[in-house]
From Swiss-Prot:
Primary residence: mitochondrion
Name of the protein: Mitochondrial outer membrane import complex protein METAXIN
Membrane topology: Multi-pass membrane protein
Top-level taxonomic group: Eukaryota
Species, as recorded: Arabidopsis thaliana
Compositionally biased spans, kind Basic and acidic residues: 267-277
UniProt GO BP: mitochondrion organization; protein targeting to mitochondrion
Length: 315
C-alpha cells in the first residue's frame, strides 16, 4: 500500500473554503483533517455544482471513488478499503467506542442543530449557497432546515425539550472529552486517530464559523484545554502543511470530465446570435429549475410549513 501511495494521485473533493477554514463544510472538514493527520499527500478540489448534495465530500484516485453517503462516510470507507487507517490498533478498545459515541453521535447532533436551528442558519449561506440566486438559496435553506429537524426528531410539540436535551448532551460530551484529553496532544496519547479528526474539525468549525452568540460555542469555550488542543494541531498539521499550497482545482462530479487546472487563455470572441440565444434559454432553465424546487419542497414538505412557521404563530 505504501508503494501505491507514492505513485497514486489522491484528490479530496469538498465544498469551498470560508471562515479561514480549508473547506467550510462541516461534513468535508473531518475528511480533510483526517488525511492531514495521516500525512497522506492529496490535492484539494472544490465542487459547487450541487450545493445540497450528500455525496460531498468524496475522495478519488483513478477509478476509485469514496463518497460521503456510502459505507459510513469517506473516512470509514478509506479505513475499510485499506487506503489509510489511523484506527487499526484502536477500534477494539472500549475507550475508543465510548469516545466515538460522544463525538460522532452527540456532538455531530449538536452541531447539526446549531447550524440549522440554534443560529438560524447564519453561516449556511457562505457554506452552501453563496453562488446561487438569493431566492433559490432561501428555498434550499428551508428545505435543509426541514430535513435537519426531521433527522433530529424535532417537532412543534417537542422542540423546547429536544433543544435542552441536545445542549445537555453536548455539555456532557465536552466535559468528558476535556477530562479524557487533559494536556495530551491526541485523544490516544501520542498517536492521531479518526476521532481526533472529527473532534478537531468540530472545534475549529464552532470557533471560526459560528457567531459569538452561539450557545454551543459558549459551552465549548468553557473548556480551555480543548481549545489549546485544537490550536496546537491546527498549527502543526494544517497551517504548516499549507505554507506552499498547490494551485486550487475546479472539480466536477467524477462522472464528468475535469477541466485542466491551468487552462490556456483565449482571446475574447464576440458572441454569436446562437450563443446569445443559448444564454437566454439558460435563464429560462434557471427559472424553471427554481419552480421545480419550489414544487418539490411543497409536495415533499406537506406539513413542513407548519413546522417552519410555528414560532411565528407563537408570537
Amino acid at each position: 500500500m505504501e508503494g501505491d501511495q507514492e505513485t497514486n494521485v489522491y484528490t479530496l473533493v469538498a465544498r469551498k473554503p470560508s471562515f479561514d477554514l480549508p473547506t467550510a463544510c462541516p461534513n468535508c472538514l473531518p475528511a480533510y483533517i483526517y488525511l492531514k493527520l495521516a500525512q497522506l499527500p492529496f490535492e484539494l478540489a472544490f465542487n459547487s455544482t450541487f450545493p445540497d448534495s450528500d455525496e460531498l465530500p468524496y475522495f478519488e484516485s483513478d477509478t476509485y471513488v469514496a463518497y460521503n453517503n456510502e459505507d459510513g462516510g469517506v473516512i470509514e470507507k478509506l479505513k475499510k478499503d485499506g487506503i489509510v487507517n489511523l484506527d487499526s490498533q484502536l477500534q477494539s478498545l472500549s475507550d475508543y467506542l465510548s469516545l466515538k459515541a460522544l463525538i460522532v453521535s452527540w456532538l455531530e447532533e449538536a452541531l447539526t442543530y446549531e447550524i440549522w436551528v440554534g443560529t438560524e442558519g447564519i453561516s449556511t449561506s457562505k457554506i452552501y449557497y453563496s453562488d446561487l440566486p438569493w431566492v433559490i438559496s432561501k428555498v434550499l435553506f428551508y428545505k435543509q432546515t426541514y430535513l435537519a429537524k426531521n433527522r433530529l426528531g424535532i417537532t412543534k410539540e417537542n422542540a423546547e425539550q429536544r433543544e435542552k436535551q441536545i445542549y445537555k448532551r453536548a455539555s456532557e460530551a465536552y466535559e468528558a472529552l476535556s477530562t479524557r484529553l487533559g494536556e495530551q496532544k491526541f485523544l490516544f496519547e501520542d498517536r492521531p486517530s479518526s476521532l481526533d479528526a472529527f473532534l478537531l474539525s468540530h472545534i475549529l468549525f464552532i470557533i471560526q464559523a459560528l457567531p459569538v452568540t452561539s450557545v454551543l460555542r459558549c459551552k465549548l469555550l468553557e473548556h480551555s484545554n480543548l481549545v489549546r488542543y485544537a490550536e496546537k494541531l491546527k498549527s502543526e498539521f494544517l497551517e504548516a502543511s499549507s505554507s506552499s499550497p498547490s494551485p486550487p482545482l475546479h472539480s466536477f462530479p467524477s462522472s464528468f470530465p475535469r477541466k485542466s487546472s491551468k487552462p490556456k487563455s483565449k482571446p475574447k470572441v464576440e458572441k454569436t446570435e446562437e450563443e446569445k440565444k443559448f444564454k437566454k434559454r439558460a435563464r429560462f432553465f434557471l427559472a424553471a429549475q427554481f419552480l421545480a424546487v419550489v414544487i418539490y419542497v411543497s409536495v415533499m414538505g406537506g406539513g413542513s410549513s407548519d413546522e417552519l412557521e410555528y414560532e411565528d404563530e407563537d408570537d
